[in-house]
Amino acid sequence: MSTRRAVGMFILTMLAAALGRCTDMLNSLGIMVIYLLWDNPMVLGYAGFVFSVGAILAIGIVTPLMSEPKGEKFWASVSIQLPMLPVVAMNYYELPLFAVFVNLIVIPALPVVFISGLLASAAGCFGVMPGKLLVFPAFAVLKLYEVLCGLVMKLPGASVITGAPDGYRIFLFYAVMSGFLVAFSLKKRAIECGLKEKGQILYSVQRVVCTAVLIAILLVKPKTAAQLDILDVGQGDGIFYRFESGTCIFIDGGSSDRKQLGENVIMLFLKYNGIQGISYWFVSHADSDHISGLSEVIDSGYTIEHIVVAEAAAKEEAMEELLFKAKEAGIDICLMSKGDSIEINDASGLRSTANEEADGIMCLYPGPADTALDRNDMCLVLKLTDGRFSGIFGGDISSEVEKKLVNEYGDELSVDFYKANHHGSRYSSSADWIEALSPRWAAVSCAAENRYGHPADEAMDRLMDAKCRVFYTMQSGQIKYKESAIYENNRQ
């Protein structure tokens, strides 16, 4: 799309020169935008079209008002990047803060790529070898771009997660920017009329303030309400919760049928919601359908402060591999046992005195002495409490463990929400367990087609008999609970 726009504008410029007429960038852009929209109105929702048109608009409108002889290249780069920040945030949910400096190297080398490409195209008519030789400078410059961008992205703070900006912030961004541009225009006229030294200093200050204010509009977000999300990960589990205090936790994060789950689902979800880091990432057990995505998230370098696992299961081979990778990434490891709790409000961390009244996470099972032949029965069982909301998350435990917990805790298990154990298996969600929990609603995380027969009709019938509303990721996609309302993506 950007190629069609660029070629069209180039043809218009050449045509104007041949006819002895003058043209300008914005008029040429307007003609090409009308043509492209006439050809296919749907390109308006295509990111490549928006980026291409937006960049030219920035060059034609913003650059003349923000650039000046002193620091011309730097402010030219800023003037192109700044108007595009909301577009970048809408499509990638993060901002590359060092892009301005990278462009100082990239933009001056663009003529090399352009000229080399044209010469190689012409030489290709006479043979492959001349074309290869002439295109080498373009290849070298593009390779340099790739290496440079890779190095920059490894720097601390190279990109900041903003989340998808809402319409209000986008409107505010461009309204404020328009105000600054009017001020820049007036100040430039004053400078040209002779108010040079004092006006020049004020003009420089205005540009810095403009840049800082516009970036702050995208970065600063109001406090949000508590939020629970059951991600659509196929045959697996992935649960996010944000406490009223703003602390974010994640439970599991894996799938047996979705490849690159961490990159394509979990990271996209976290970035879209503007989650800059996870304070506690709980791992129920080390089956791949619970940790495959987490492993990818660790590899990506995303901020995770603590990974929490059951102390009784920490020595399993698969768990040891995951924890080794986490330690290599600088993530703190917490071992949790029955009775331990993490209180969120006072950030007191892991402690061995259970306090059910405090907001946070309490471990119900397993204890140091618990053993089981099946790894599923050594899953971390957690009770979450946050104000008036509470939930139970039991991984893949069977009815045997459920029975043990009912006998030990009884009515203390009562919660609002229940994440169905073992993806709705017939061997979980027993009648006594559901009666003890008495949840208002439950979520089943599984794939529409799986070889395990999840969710089992027997287990779902037991939930329905208890007057519990049941939601399925295989039908609804991602399930969200926020401000006492349940939202579904409605995949079907």
Spell out what each predicted region is:
Residues L26, V78, L110-P111, R258, ...:
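A generic short alpha-helical patch detector that favors 3-5-residue windows
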Residues A109-G124:
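Internal helical hairpin/lid segments
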Residues A99, I107-L110:
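Glycine-rich phosphate/pyrophosphate-binding beta-alpha loops
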Residues F10, V43, N103, A122-Q492:
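Non-globular, low-confidence helical/coil segments that flank catalytic cores
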Residues M1-V100, S116, G163-P222, A431, ...:
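Hydrophobic alpha-helical transmembrane segments in multi-pass membrane proteins
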